[in-house]
Every structure is written in structure tokens, then in C-alpha cells.
Amino acid sequence: MKIVIVNGRGRVGKDLFCEYAHDNRGMVYSISIVDRVKQVALFAGWSGEKDARGRKFLSDLKDAMSEYDDLPRKYVLDWMRQKLDIYEDSMIGTDNIVFLVHAREPKDIKRWVEENGARALLIHRPDVEKSWGNHADDEVENYDYDYYLTNDGSLYDWERKSIDFIDRIRKESWESKI
């Protein structure tokens, strides 16, 4: 089982990367450490729009939830354990599972790497806005990533890059832990 932290500014193609990897390679699962934060934000009146105002709200709420009870991280770890339990109870096993975890902040990425043996991927797209006005989005490049991918071609090119990336890391000898 491998955990890859997926990061990049808004609108660089992270979700599409994860979708392509899942659809073409199987046993690839994507989750964000702000998934539970988004649920709380919707309850609190957030419209669901990821404009600059919405992104700042999510960033601030994530900070508060993390500081209070580490809920964003706990939610992801529990979700992973549930997925692993399904495979451990089957004949398939967990060796080829890849979890793609969306995390923005360097401190969160560092924690996943140190505590769980994750690796970190930065996705870049040359034509994307560089500043969103919140620290979570604006500081994505303040980390020394293990992998870098540039989304600068067609959708087909991006699909190929996602497939090639999954194939590559599955061949590598490192493992993650929960």
C-alpha cells in the first residue's frame, strides 16, 4: 500500500489526475483532508463555490478543525482503514492499493511523510493563477516534493501522465503505513 500526497494550486488538474488514475489502473483511491471540512462548511452556509472567498473560508475552517481535534486527518485515516479492511478480508491483498491524498499545507504533507511513509507529488500547470489569497493555496510550492508533474498538454496527455505515474510508483520498493 502506498500513500501519495497530491498537491498543486487550484485548477491545475489534481482531481482529473486522480480520476484518470482510478479509472485506468484500479485500486487507486482519492480523498482530501478537507472532505470533512467541506461537509461542515456546507452546513455552516458555504455555497460550495471554490472562488477566493470560499477557498479562504475552507482554509480557515480546516485550520480550526485541525487545531481543535485533528479531525481532517482522523477522517482520512479512518476512511483508509475501511478500504484496507475490504481488501485484507479478500484474496486480493493490499499491496497494489494507492491512496492519493489531497493536502495543501507543508506541515500536513510533512506529517504524512514522517508518520505514514507517504511520498509527495506537486502538480503544476503553467497557465493557472498563482495566488488565491489564503495560505493553504498560496504556499503549495513551499515543500520539497518527491515527484513533479506538469499538466501542459491535452486531456489525453494528462491521462497518459496519470497512468504512467501510477505504474511507476507501483514498481518502486517503498511502502506506506497507517
Residue ranges and their predicted role:
Residues 1-4:
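Extreme N-terminal starter segment of soluble prokaryotic enzymes
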Residues 102-105:
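Short, well-ordered beta-to-alpha junction loops that form the rim of enzyme active sites
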Residues 22-30:
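Post-Walker A helix-loop "phosphate-sensing" segment adjacent to the P-loop in P-loop NTPases
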Residues 14-15:
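Walker A/P-loop
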Residues 109-115, 119-178:
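Small-molecule kinase domains that catalyze NTP-dependent phosphoryl transfer to phosphate-bearing small molecules
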Residues 6-8, 100:
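Hydrophobic anchor at the beta1->P-loop junction of P-loop NTPases
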Residues 11:
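Walker A (P-loop) phosphate-binding loop of P-loop NTPases
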Residues 32-97:
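ATP-dependent small-molecule kinase phosphotransfer cores
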